[in-house]
Amino acid sequence: MRRQRRHNVPALAVAAVTSVGVAVVLALVYAPSYVNYDAQWALVWASDLWLGVTPEYTADFAPTPHPLATAVSSLALAFGHEAHLAILWLSLLSFGALVYLTYRLGEELFHPWVGVVAALVVLTRPAMERDALIGYQDMPFAVLVIGAVLLEARRPRRGVAVLALLAVAGLLRPEAWVLAGLYWLYLWPPAAPAERARTAALVLAAPLIWAASDWIVTGDPLHSLHGTAALAEEADRRRSPEQVPYWTAKYFGYALREPMMLGVPIGLGFAWLYGRRRAALPAAIVVAMTAVFAAGPLFGLPLIRRYVETPAVLLTLFYGLAVCGWMLLPAGRARSRWMAVGGLALALSVAYVPWHVTKLQNVDRRIEVDGRMYAHLQVAAEAPVVRAAFARCAPLTAADHRPIPFARFWLDGAPGSVTTVESGASPMGRMLLLPRRNRSTGRVYKKSTFPRVKPPDGFRQIYRNPSWRVFAAPGCSA
């Protein structure tokens, strides 16, 4: 027991150092300063709950509410208007944990160097870094799922511990419900009746909690399904079953980039020849999660790249096998051949480095430019003249949906106090928020999509900064 404890302490220390180290490096390199639209809405809903009002799940263009994201956002509210920074750090720490867990899973299933290569791939993917840098819940979700896979890899049919992690993950994304259900069926044959009942409770916990929260807030236990489908239609997102094959492949390519996608089939071939049993677990998870992604349009759900992020992380293990699988083989002709194949797979990735660096620089530019735009929005919402007018004349109308949760949070507004005229979602209020045309807003508001909304007659400008203007009706400002 003491030996086990001594072994666990260094492992936990390495995990903590890796998580914190990756988070600090990303923070220093990119200086992230804002969270994504969904995460900002979670902060708004958490604030509603703490104020004792019904969360505004049915607001104009509101995203899908994720129960765990809202619960965690409640803790971040202690930081006031800077609560988004707490969410950002949690996301960055989750990304660091994901890098570590990827290494541990590769080591457990195959070889330490397979884990090292896979972890380096995860660490350097522009799409994954970008999601971590703006606080998407897909980061902690991936950590929970990969953690569950690691527990199962260490001890097959582990049961409760794996299902517990999937239950928590199921409060962030519903794909975990399917994984939990399939795992429960896998546990069924040798399990006693009492164990089946106990594990079934864990399988059902997340979907029941999610449905209950939707029902309590909106009166519709399937609000998340209906709302997500409706928003996908409003935003004209990809949601046709005919688009599934193309965009599934495209999104995996976006997540891993081209050289990795060329290396993954090589790794799958190696696994088929030399490690089928060890590769079965991550391969099964990839297949199951990809199938859930592909089935989404049948229910009106959109095809979004982030939805394949967790299976993409698991595919990095097979790229690691392509590069380092030869280390698993005894000396001989096969080992030499696979060493050459691994060298080729690695060479393709190295040749792609200049393009890859450009993509990482694009992430940096996006974080910097969009961060400036949202910083200007916070300054506008906190300006005394704007807050005074808002107190007299709410609701504030935004030209489009993007500023809604940010403006509402920084204005300390009540449900319904910030709306949009986009697609006729709400009528014009007595205040209007408009973006300005400049470099800070140019990435989000391109020329073809810039809101074409004009202030109504009688409105006058009461505030402006480099990115935003605020107009108000007569009598709203001093």
Regions found by a protein language model. Give the residues of each.
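Short acidic/glycine- and proline-prone juxtamembrane loop motifs at membrane-interface regions
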Residues: 36, 127-140
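Hydrophobic/aromatic-rich transmembrane helices and adjacent perimembrane loops
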Residues: 131-132, 138, 172, 178, ...
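Membrane-lumen/periplasm interface segments of specific transmembrane helices
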Residues: 41, 180-181, 193-265, 347-362
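Membrane-embedded, lumen/periplasm-facing catalytic core of multi-pass transferases
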Residues: 345-405
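Perimembrane helix-loop-helix junctions
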Residues: 154-155, 159-160, 178-205, 273-276
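Transmembrane-helix motifs of polytopic, lipid-linked glycan transferases
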Residues: 89-109
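Hydrophobic, aromatic-rich transmembrane alpha-helices
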Residues: 184-188, 253-283, 287-290
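Signature aromatic-anchored transmembrane alpha helix within multi-pass, membrane-resident enzymes
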Residues: 15-18, 164, 201-208, 263-267, ...
